[in-house]
């Protein structure tokens, strides 16, 4: 009788189970809310590489063919080029690297955009640089300023100080002149874009276009979109690369997606957005990583020489088109990542020299690690400059990048750090701009962009 009295009834068990389920669901909801809050906070992380809206738009002028020579014939660096910090963001961790000669230009509220022709320097700082700046973003946008950091010129501090003491009428006249100048620069950039489209011509054969280096003096402007459809079924996102043309037209170039059931990251690239299999006729190359996910190699659609020794001609064995190396980031440093890109050299006809290693010891990565760089070109990401005013690393993307992200980067050559070989950056949640120049081709540039998406130790 006592045992029956002490035993809990079915109603008590049900209430206890309901309470347990309610608490578990509450914990799951709290964890989901914390995760979403963390992702939003990470997106707004101030230490991410971002375009700084506080510097005036630089004039974009087409480069002459002689300015591209460092990528063809090696030469000594110019004496007037400042090479501080070009080896990556690690230089910013050292105290002696704080005194960089290239500084971001800060536009004070109330002062007009400085003219290009006037240069000035002052020992004292402008008083308005430390003053609060309400609605700074709107004021800068009225001046037509969309990107940041002037790497070529010193900040015009004297001009800023003079603007603080000038009369309102003088300020209005200078503002009008700056607006006219911005309009003329916009028109010039539009003419340059039309000339670039004319030199590129129509893309008739996607495979030939993907393998061919960009024309000298022409910036190929593309957009990369990420399609997350199917991720709920265990599929990886699909990435599409489109060529931007005038009048908001775009032409499909490449598509890529990560393979399933692979020990390492393997991205297959195709010229057919509906067929991303390796057996498809449109398969043109792949991007493969090492086990750590810090080194990547780009191949064309040729045959692996190890698997087909003596069975195929040398002309059909695969080429290595590029190697991408990320410096391992294990200390939690949330600043820009350091990356190196190795590509085959170019001959005197501006064509890529075929690079067909027979084994791993002859690969691009092995030659780069052994410093055997004959007929090879080494590129690296341009080190961003820390801006105390915005508390972030900034690069001048010329208005092509609008959102902060650790994936934003520019690639340059050591002998000419002002010549942007490639730049990549976020403009929306799943939209990125990808612009590349000679000597890169579309497949190389797309693969470099894909490597930055991979969830690797160097990117965390």
UniProtKB/Swiss-Prot annotation:
Q: What is its main location?
A: nucleus
Could you tell me where the Low complexity compositional bias lies? 166-188
Where is it localised? Nucleus; Cell membrane; Cell projection, Cilium; Cytoplasm
MF term (GO), any: phosphatidylinositol binding
Q: Give the protein's recorded name.
A: Tubby-related protein 3
* Compositional bias ranges of the Acidic residues kind: 151-162
Region Disordered, as annotated, extends over: 37-132, 151-193
Is Signal included in the keywords of this UniProt record?
A: no
